[in-house]
Amino acid sequence: MTAYEELRTKLVLAPKRWLITGVAGFIGSGLLEELLFLNQTVIGLDNFSTGYQHNLDDVRTSVSEEQWSRFIFIQGDIRKFTDCQKACKNVDYVLHQAALGSVPRSLKDPIATNSANIDGFLNMLTAARDAHVSSFTYAASSSTYGDHPDLPKIEERIGRPLSPYAVTKYVNELYADVFARSYEFNAIGLRYFNVFGRRQNPNGAYSAVIPRWILSLLKDEPIYINGDGSTSRDFCYIENVIQANLLSATTNDLASKNKVYNVAVGDRTSLNELYYLIRDGLNLWRNEQSRAEPIYKDFRDGDVKHSQADITKIKTFLSYEPEFDIKEGLKQTLKWYIDKHSTLYSSV
């Protein structure tokens, strides 16, 4: 039995009270679903700026009515300290996912990104400290590595940030570290590497590449690749991220606390490889033989050419073991979008 399997069993036997910020978002709704499956009580905070009611509705269809009754939703904003205080009351564990999470968005509107990602983060840290929560796990980002050339990326080696978004996520780490040293506060940062999976928004100017390409191919629309397609990423399926959050929040090992960890698979896939995995995967699911080819555009400002994580640290300290590689994660993701796209995204 893995450490994560043992933890899931333990949580069912001794339920806790959790707060998820950004609960109506892609990752937040995934965490909500898993915690409700485990019969936990979950408080969710969201202002629907980038999250969606239909994500919460979809979670509701996947859990029992009894499990759903353990979910308490607060429509609020992390930029308002009183909302953060209300959400943190009587909470054991905080999973802070709320943020404006787009490099292009941050280049277009750095002030809004700073407000949500730094001011909002500090509000949540302070409210959680004052509420004496057991732990505060927050979404950090692989963008923190910036222009550092080394591959794979190791937590202790970072470069200069390449976007306002990257600046905000690094500032999160600095604040968490100061709170840990100044207030004996338990915070763990998770540097996510290109997370994908069910409920990830395929629409809009700032959509991630995997859901956008899936929806476009389902609608027989052209696929655009920024650059020549050799750009590569360490794509990480949502279930791996959920595992990392729960292991981080509940660890009792002092040596593992107040650290930052990469959350990824530890491998990389080029955009060209990704395109054909998605196209051919959809062909299998739909019993079709599409041979559509991508259209190449200019490289996108603020992006790094290659990204791959070293996951030795999180495996060592938290016993994290990614259960889904890119192929298995895509298999699950494609099935979800094929089943759901006509009802959730048909109007776009």
From Swiss-Prot:
<comment type="function">
    <text>Epimerase required for the biosynthesis of the capsular polysaccharide, commonly referred as the Vi antigen, an important virulence factor. Catalyzes the reversible epimerization of UDP-N-acetylglucosaminuronic acid (UDP-GlcNAcA) to UDP-N-acetylgalactosaminuronic acid (UDP-GalNAcA). Also catalyzes, with lower efficiency, the reversible epimerization of UDP-N-acetylglucosamine (UDP-GlcNAc) to UDP-N-acetylgalactosamine (UDP-GalNAc). Cannot use UDP-glucose (UDP-Glc) and UDP-galactose (UDP-Gal) as substrates.</text>
</comment>
<feature type="binding site">
    <location>
        <position position="27"/>
    </location>
    <ligand>
        <name>NAD(+)</name>
    </ligand>
</feature>
<dbReference type="InterPro" id="IPR001509">
    <property type="entry name" value="Epimerase_deHydtase"/>
</dbReference>
<dbReference type="GO" id="GO:0016853">
    <property type="term" value="F:isomerase activity"/>
</dbReference>
<feature type="binding site">
    <location>
        <position position="78"/>
    </location>
    <ligand>
        <name>NAD(+)</name>
    </ligand>
</feature>
<comment type="pathway">
    <text>Glycan metabolism; Vi-antigen biosynthesis.</text>
</comment>
<feature type="binding site">
    <location>
        <position position="26"/>
    </location>
    <ligand>
        <name>NAD(+)</name>
    </ligand>
</feature>
<dbReference type="GO" id="GO:0045227">
    <property type="term" value="P:capsule polysaccharide biosynthetic process"/>
</dbReference>
<protein>
    <recommendedName>
        <fullName>UDP-N-acetyl-alpha-D-glucosaminouronate 4-epimerase</fullName>
        <ecNumber>5.1.3.45</ecNumber>
        <ecNumber>5.1.3.7</ecNumber>
    </recommendedName>
</protein>
<feature type="binding site">
    <location>
        <position position="50"/>
    </location>
    <ligand>
        <name>NAD(+)</name>
    </ligand>
</feature>
<feature type="active site" description="Proton acceptor">
    <location>
        <position position="165"/>
    </location>
</feature>
<keyword id="KW-0972">Capsule biogenesis/degradation</keyword>
<dbReference type="Pfam" id="PF01370">
    <property type="entry name" value="Epimerase"/>
</dbReference>
<keyword id="KW-0547">Nucleotide-binding</keyword>
<feature type="binding site">
    <location>
        <position position="195"/>
    </location>
    <ligand>
        <name>NAD(+)</name>
    </ligand>
</feature>
<feature type="binding site">
    <location>
        <position position="165"/>
    </location>
    <ligand>
        <name>NAD(+)</name>
    </ligand>
</feature>
<dbReference type="InterPro" id="IPR050177">
    <property type="entry name" value="Lipid_A_modif_metabolic_enz"/>
</dbReference>
<feature type="binding site">
    <location>
        <position position="169"/>
    </location>
    <ligand>
        <name>NAD(+)</name>
    </ligand>
</feature>
<comment type="subunit">
    <text>Homodimer.</text>
</comment>
<feature type="binding site">
    <location>
        <position position="97"/>
    </location>
    <ligand>
        <name>NAD(+)</name>
    </ligand>
</feature>
<keyword id="KW-0520">NAD</keyword>
<feature type="binding site">
    <location>
        <position position="51"/>
    </location>
    <ligand>
        <name>NAD(+)</name>
    </ligand>
</feature>
<keyword id="KW-0413">Isomerase</keyword>
<comment type="similarity">
    <text>Belongs to the NAD(P)-dependent epimerase/dehydratase family.</text>
</comment>
<feature type="binding site">
    <location>
        <position position="46"/>
    </location>
    <ligand>
        <name>NAD(+)</name>
    </ligand>
</feature>
<comment type="pathway">
    <text>Capsule biogenesis; capsule polysaccharide biosynthesis.</text>
</comment>
<dbReference type="GO" id="GO:0000166">
    <property type="term" value="F:nucleotide binding"/>
</dbReference>
<dbReference type="InterPro" id="IPR036291">
    <property type="entry name" value="NAD(P)-bd_dom_sf"/>
</dbReference>
<feature type="binding site">
    <location>
        <position position="77"/>
    </location>
    <ligand>
        <name>NAD(+)</name>
    </ligand>
</feature>
